[in-house]
Amino acid sequence: MHALRSSVLALWLCLHVSVRAWMTYRSANGLDEYEPEDRIIFVGTKWCGNGNVAEGPEDLGSLKETDACCREHDMCPDLIEAGQSKHGLTNTASYTRLNCACDEKFYNCLKNSSETGSGAVRFTYFTLLGTMCYRNEHPLICVKKGWFSCSKYELDQSQPKRYQWFDVSSNFAFPRMLT
């Protein structure tokens, strides 16, 4: 059963990467008209993916705990849409980026869920997608590079706080969690 679940997850991830590549191509070539059929929603959910297929805020899929986490994440009040600017930051990604507090809450919600699907959603969002979030914090200095991003930061307490981008990763290494 574990091998089947792993194979399904791998297939879903390959499909997701292919669709993201197609969406990036469409956007870069002026074909970024968003169609509902372009949505990829994680199986068993209505809110976990790019957009949602829910009929309303109370409409959840069969993975109710996981879906509730995604719904709350989708409703984050502090976000920067693709191509937009806020807090002196410009989101150059092709998707919305959120305040780190929303991503941290999402991570903890998925981690505390007893459903199997929550682990796959958490792995996809926090490990595979390589997204970023923002927060008002003292400037960061990267003291150790990982494979794809900085793996250890230090805060420069001598400088004033400012809004800045942070890597969202599986270890969720945000400044307030560092020593």
Swiss-Prot record:
UniProt keyword Transcription, yes or no: no
UniProt-listed SUPFAM superfamilies: Phospholipase A2, PLA2
Residues the record marks as active site: 73, 103
GO terms for biological process, alphabetical: arachidonate secretion; lipid catabolic process; phospholipid metabolic process
Disulfide bonds: 48-70, 69-109, 76-102, 100-133, 142-150
GO molecular function list: metal ion binding; phospholipase A2 activity
Cofactors, names only: Ca(2+)
Cell location: Secreted
Glycosylation site list: 112
Keywords in alphabetical order: Calcium, Disulfide bond, Glycoprotein, Hydrolase, Lipid degradation, Lipid metabolism, Metal-binding, Secreted, Signal
Expression sites (tissue/organ): Expressed by the venom gland.
Maturation propeptide residues: 22-39
This enzyme's EC code(s): 3.1.1.4
Similarity comment: Belongs to the phospholipase A2 family. Group III subfamily.
Protein name: Phospholipase A2
